[in-house]
Amino acid sequence: MPTDGKLLDSSETHEVVHPASAPSRFSAVETILLAQGRRLFSWLSVGWAIGALLYFFPPYEPGWRLAALIFGIGAALLATTWSRLRFRALAFTLLTLSGGFLDAELSAHRLPPMPALPSRAVILHAHINRIDILPPRHGETPGRRLILQNAVFETGIDIGMPPLRRLLRVRLREDDTTPLQAGQEIRLRALFRQPSWPSLPGGRDPQREAWFANIAGNGYALGPATALSPPTRQSLEKLREHVAVTISQTLSGQRAAIAATLLAGESSGIDPRTRQDFAASGLAHLLAVAGLHLGLVMAFVIVFLRAALAAWPYAALRWPCREIAALGGFGIGIDYVLLTGAHLPAVRSLGMAALATLALMTGRHVLSMRSLALIGLAILIVAPASVLDISFQMSFAAVMALIAGYEALRERLLDLRGEGGFLRLLISHITALALTSLLAGAATLPVSVAHFGNLQPWFVLANLLAVPLAAIWVMPSGVCALLLMPFHLAAPFLILMGWGIGVIITLAHAVAMLPYAENPVPAMPGWGLTLYLLALCVLCLWKGPPRLFALAPMALALIAPWLAAKPIVLVSPDAGLMAVRDQNHLELGPFGSLEDETRDEWVKALALPISSLLAHPGCTETACPVEHNGRKILLRLRDRQDGRLLPSEEACRHAVLFVSASPAHGACPGAAVIDRFSVWRDGAYAVFATRQGLNLVSDRSTRGARLWVPKIGSHGMPNLPLAQEE
């Protein structure tokens, strides 16, 4: 039995100490900790994530002093009580929780403040940081969105000012065909706005996302872009374009579009119907290059190289074939990530692949909880806000479930493989692929439901078929095609890849047509998602039968969407859209295209079909009375008089709440009021019914005074000149 001093050592070979056999000198807590062995190391990243999450909870900007004090106490406790196991575990708990909190606070405060953006159309020049290809809208041609850095506005007050320290996102016009590449300096006329307020209290927070993404605002071009300098990075773009052109010369339609996505990161050719089918069937992840694709590419290359080296007697006897294959697979993986655009999920997966390659080179376990914890801890230290990111949550939930699942089923899988005959090998590999889809899909389904508000019950069936097809047919053919393109021999493998893609497209369409393929689910409250992820960590990381107790909080988290209170009235951040919820519908007032995103967020949050509020008896744009449990609410949906014409005394009689798209100007005395000035100050509103009356909840009251929440009346920090040197 190893000594307790090795509790948080990185070694995995650890004899489990059962409570019955633990020495009497250990307390009950120490006995439990000893039984976990070195698996406790994996909890360091969990503690860091919880600490980072604690920074985002308060409705105010928390100070750093208390967390720093706790960190100091943890460090002192670790230094003075290292020989006592329970105190050492407590010290690491304090260190990780406070460390994650301090890291998140430092990450938030080191970013530049939100700048004030011009309120009118402006000409600017900037450098292109990145170009995103956007899917077509309503059958139009694919769009382009530029991520601009070092932007300088050509306005009177901005002359001589330093460039913006944050990035700008701007969508180009559909008819702008100017060839642009990352690194170029451009001149452009555009209209910008700051990051949007949340569409409803407690909903998705675009302002927080923009703060940590270093984004200053979004805009759209009013004219064509003019290139002021040649591109500085051409080789990858040209190579990506060459791959896409070669694919289009061999394949056609959606097969060519998906092949270009998988091999060159060019997703603009995928039409809305295909995207909808893949989303409804739970296969949308196949259209976004990430860890799955990288893993399939590297696995194919490693298996091929190792088999080829083993078939050569000289190499098999003298060379480290496994290590050579691992390095070759990792090298191809790097090339693949760069070729497909180096998107953040793929880059994150490449870091995990680097650790897996290192494990192969040193004879360690390729996938272990320790390596997953190290990668997670590294990502959280660099970007603690990742704890709120869906890609981070889904990636680590999936990998953690895979490692735990394969650990639990290892003996049965070995029995299935037997002596290694061809048929048994084939069955074991297919079973492993199916098990991978099942474990990863089951672990990430609640996370997907929490973020997207959609339950796809047939996703398991679709992934059980599609992922093995992608692993043994589509991606190997694609890798062979890429390697043979310089020799003009890629066509046969592209055709083979196209056949496999065609099968997956047919499968996605068939599953999307099944009954109940898509089921809207109400928004999961934050505590529900947090509870689920913590319960999943306990289920996967804890050793022994007590981990099954995590199933109870996990079940509670899964029903959380139906336990949370639902608003009866919603008001958008600009009061341009209002909605009333009844039992079966979300009744919407009149709105324009600018409110489409808000409408979609409301529908996703409440999981109800929409209908027109104007169809309500006695409802007009200027006076729309509705009742809820005997309480009268008066809505003014539109007002061309800008509030100058007050509602009649009859309309206001017995009203307990007056909601107006224009200034209320003292209308309906005695009633609570939400008007245009209310949302200007506090953002979107949600009205909840309680036994005592109506509870008015604003976005500002929910988020509080945080760095990314604009102060009342604030338009951002003016772009001031730098101080002159002495």
Describe each PLM feature range:
Residues P2-R38, L94-H285, P663-E726:
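Membrane-interface helix/helix-cap signal primarily in integral membrane proteins
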